[in-house]
């Protein structure tokens, strides 16, 4: 599959993948495996930004559904993404990959604030930049945060690593006949409500012509294969 030439990418990981085979929290061994994938991608000469969800620790919408105030629950979810970012930073630096965490909620003792020009300098110095705390405001998902940072950092593509190997016309977990798309347009994703990212994230990528590449991060070596245009994936583009 022909992919756009990529020099800088943003990798979005769902928080759930950090659980490994656990039901909750962070599996340090699996985080290390993910860090090895990121290191291998960086060694291909790519500049890499990362955004990690927080669903393995706390999901704001789930808290709101159980009676919490939505804004308060969303802030808790943002803090969960900072914990995940620090876990990934620790794993990457154990592998010798220099990493910086920037949070949209300022917490100077543990990470930097989001400053675009500073992030640019980090990338130019071959560091991985992990953006945490979403967009820093409630009612926005980490998918929207990933799309925003991809646009802000002029990324050539947004790679979404999940537990499924692409975009399907229905849920492959419940429908064995679900069809996987090799490529699909932003418009169809929005019109058919395909489960790629939330609508605002897809629209932001569409408006800034940022391809979204959906693939399974659980398969060892899959990130490198996807970046080489190999393996199973779905590309969302115009």
UniProtKB/Swiss-Prot annotation:
Residues where UMP binds: 54, 74, 135-142
Keyword Transmembrane annotated: no
InterPro entries the UniProt entry points to: AceGlu_kinase-like_sf, Asp/Glu/Uridylate_kinase, Uridylate_kinase, Uridylate_kinase_bac
UniProt entry keywords in alphabetical sequence: ATP-binding, Cytoplasm, Kinase, Nucleotide-binding, Pyrimidine biosynthesis, Transferase
Entry keyword Heme: no
Domain of life, per lineage: Bacteria
Name under which the protein is recorded: Uridylate kinase
Substrates-to-products reaction catalysed: UMP + ATP = UDP + ADP
Gene that encodes it: pyrH
CDD domains: AAK_UMPK-PyrH-Ec (cd04254)
TM helices/strands, residue ranges: none
Compartments where located: Cytoplasm
Activity control: Inhibited by UTP.
One Pfam short name: AA_kinase
Pathway annotation from the record: Pyrimidine metabolism; CTP biosynthesis via de novo pathway; UDP from UMP (UMPK route): step 1/1
UniProt-annotated binding residues for ATP: 12-15, 55, 59, 162, 168, 171
The protein's Enzyme Commission number: 2.7.4.22
Cellular component aspect of the GO annotation: cytoplasm
Function: Catalyzes the reversible phosphorylation of UMP to UDP.
GO molecular function: ATP binding; UMP kinase activity
A biological process term (GO) from this entry: UDP biosynthetic process
Assembly: Homohexamer.
Family: Belongs to the UMP kinase family.
């Amino acid at each position: 599959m022909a992919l756009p030439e990529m020099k800088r990418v943003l990798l979005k990981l769902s928080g759930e993948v950090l659980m490994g085979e656990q039901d909750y929290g962070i599996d340090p061994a699996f985080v290390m495996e993910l860090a090895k994938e990121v290191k291998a991608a960086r060694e291909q000469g790519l500049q890499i930004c990362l955004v990690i969800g927080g669903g393995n620790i706390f999901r704001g919408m789930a808290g709101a559904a159980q009676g919490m105030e939505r804004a308060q629950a969303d802030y808790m979810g943002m803090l969960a993404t900072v914990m995940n970012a620090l876990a990934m930073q620790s794993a990457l630096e154990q592998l010798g990959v220099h990493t910086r965490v920037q949070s949209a909620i300022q917490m100077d003792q543990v990470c930097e604030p989001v400053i675009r020009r500073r992030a640019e300098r980090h990338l130019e110095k071959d560091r991985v930049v992990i953006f945490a705390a979403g967009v820093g405001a409630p009612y926005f998902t980490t998918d929207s945060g990933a799309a925003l940072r991809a646009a802000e950092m002029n990324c050539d593509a947004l790679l979404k690593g999940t537990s499924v190997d692409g975009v399907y016309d229905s849920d492959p977990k419940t429908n064995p006949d679900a069809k996987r798309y090799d490529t699909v347009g932003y418009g169809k994703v929005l019109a058919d409500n395909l489960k790629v990212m939330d609508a605002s994230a897809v629209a932001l990528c569409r408006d800034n012509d940022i391809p979204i590449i959906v693939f399974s991060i659980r398969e060892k070596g899959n990130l490198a294969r996807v970046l080489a245009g190999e393996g199973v994936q779905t590309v969302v583009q115009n």
